[in-house]
Amino acid sequence: MRCSHNVNIGQRQPRKRPLQQQQQHQLQQQTRAGSRSVNSRISVAQRVLAVPTDYGRSPARDCGHFPLYHVRRKLIDGR
């Protein structure tokens, strides 16, 4: 599988909503985007469902995009 860890670098990740609120928000966005093309709605769904990088998974360590994995882990966790 191609490494996709650098895909979302540079795009500010939106603050994660609680799940219920997120689903409501998605519905609102879809009804608002209803007049637009199907493609825009799909991209909205992709943006909503985009998962921020999980530093705990091994691919992040293995793919070479995170050479300072443990340092970053410490910074993120505050340990």
UniProtKB/Swiss-Prot annotation:
Residues 19-30 have a biased composition (Low complexity). Residues 1-40 are annotated as: Disordered. It comes from the Viruses. Residues 1-10, 31-40 have a biased composition (Polar residues). This is Protein B5. It comes from Human herpesvirus 6B (strain Z29). The gene is B5.
